[in-house]
Amino acid sequence: MKYTEIMVRYGELSTKGKNRKTFIMQLAQNVKRALADFPALKIHADRDRMHILLNGEDSEEVIPKLSKVFGIQNFSPSIRIEKEMPAIRAMVQEVVREVYTPGKTFKITAKRSDHSFELDSNGLNQELGGAVIEAIPEIQVQMKKPDINLRIEIRKDAAYLSYETIRGAGGLPVGTSGRGMLMLSGGIDSPVAGYLAMKRGVEVEAVHFASPPYTSEQALQKAKDLAEKLVPYVGTIQFIEVPFTEIQEEIKRVVPQGYLMTITRRLMLRLTDAIREMRKGLVIINGESLAQVASQTLQSMVAINEVTSTPIIRPVVSMDKTEIIEIAEKIDTFELAIQPFEDCCTIFAPPQPKTRPRLDKAQEYEARLDLEGLMARALEGLKITEISAETAKDKQEDEFADFL
């Protein structure tokens, strides 16, 4: 089937009142960026929906990219038809013959935005329903949940026919909720947290702590690859590598073993908050899931969070591990996340970390550190890399060249 346009429905944007125009403009920008590989496309966004004119581009290639753009409830590939009843009838019959298999039911859903057209919506439903039965006499009408829902829209310029409704990514357009710093480890949970934050409109920058030689180059690349998996949903991600070796060595030297993880996490949070301020972010996002590990009990969260007043978003905090894994598999981060490379949270992990650390003890042990100097040197050594679809493509080409 040769489609001529894709009709996009906004979903939650329809509830945004006075801010609606801003949300729609951001969505249009995000769609344009996601479909940048298709230069012939034209995008028209109005109050109720968006129309993507294909202009000869292949809908089969466009649809997978469009399905990852947050802010879209669903969309329908459509066929443009001359606004004359004989032409509309003929196309309806052609489409239903192509998609019908024995036992399927159908329904006609007509909408007439051009009120000068010869038939109203009810008239179109009746006329085109008759055309379907004429083409396939044995087909049955089903008004609720039909197998085939033929949608006809009569606009000023032409008539448009669609029969397929594809579920979108939902949520809000990325960029409408401000910027957040994602504490991206190499595990399963943090990429899922980033994905869920982006779904609510947050522009995410990834903060990753590296402690060479204790953590390897492969572990760092794994974190970058995880960030790359999130790129199709957002366009580009700034990957911020934080040198953490000196800090971890000093923590190990002066802090009792049971509090190593608590103090390590406090320093990570302090640094992430400092980076957030530098990068003009509003929130911190992490992959903490309540009581999953020692540093994620409520008592640990209290002892760690004390270092900042910045809001911390924990999208997976109440999820079971199986629920998190299900999303990780959906966004294709799971197999990558389970690769066995050490990260900063595991290299000096004590055999018996405190699950109920006391805040006063955490403050006492942290005071043994030269916080100002350690943080200043770490912040001076930040490495920021932009990860985009283009950089991912270049990496694939380099890997292929190495293989040859």
From Swiss-Prot:
Swiss-Prot/TrEMBL GO biological process terms: thiamine biosynthetic process; thiamine diphosphate biosynthetic process; thiazole biosynthetic process; tRNA 4-thiouridine biosynthesis
Domain THUMP residue range list: 60-165
Binding site for ATP: M183, L184, H208, F209, R265, G287, Q296
Catalytic activity: [ThiI sulfur-carrier protein]-S-sulfanyl-L-cysteine + a uridine in tRNA + 2 reduced [2Fe-2S]-[ferredoxin] + ATP + H(+) = [ThiI sulfur-carrier protein]-L-cysteine + a 4-thiouridine in tRNA + 2 oxidized [2Fe-2S]-[ferredoxin] + AMP + diphosphate; [ThiS sulfur-carrier protein]-C-terminal Gly-Gly-AMP + S-sulfanyl-L-cysteinyl-[cysteine desulfurase] + AH2 = [ThiS sulfur-carrier protein]-C-terminal-Gly-aminoethanethioate + L-cysteinyl-[cysteine desulfurase] + A + AMP + 2 H(+)
Record-listed E.C. numbers: 2.8.1.4
Pathway membership: Cofactor biosynthesis; thiamine diphosphate biosynthesis
Record key words, sorted: ATP-binding, Cytoplasm, Nucleotide-binding, RNA-binding, Thiamine biosynthesis, Transferase, tRNA-binding
SUPFAM superfamilies with a match to the protein in the record: Adenine nucleotide alpha hydrolases-like, THUMP domain-like
Highest taxon listed in the record's lineage: Bacteria
Molecular function GO labels: ATP binding; CCA tRNA nucleotidyltransferase activity; tRNA binding; tRNA-uracil-4 sulfurtransferase activity
GO cellular component: cytosol
InterPro entries: Rossmann-like_a/b/a_fold, ThiI_AANH, ThiI_fer, ThiI_N, THUMP_dom, THUMP_ThiI, tRNA_STrfase, tRNA_sulfurtransferase_ThiI
Signal sequence annotation: none
Protein localization: Cytoplasm
UniProt cross-references to HAMAP family, sorted A to Z: ThiI
Role played: Catalyzes the ATP-dependent transfer of a sulfur to tRNA to produce 4-thiouridine in position 8 of tRNAs, which functions as a near-UV photosensor. Also catalyzes the transfer of sulfur to the sulfur carrier protein ThiS, forming ThiS-thiocarboxylate. This is a step in the synthesis of thiazole, in the thiamine biosynthesis pathway. The sulfur is donated as persulfide by IscS.
UniProt similarity note: Belongs to the ThiI family.
Name the UniProt record assigns to this protein: Probable tRNA sulfurtransferase
Organism of provenance: Enterococcus faecalis (strain ATCC 700802 / V583)
Phylogenetic lineage: Bacteria, Bacillati, Bacillota, Bacilli, Lactobacillales
Gene name of the record: thiI
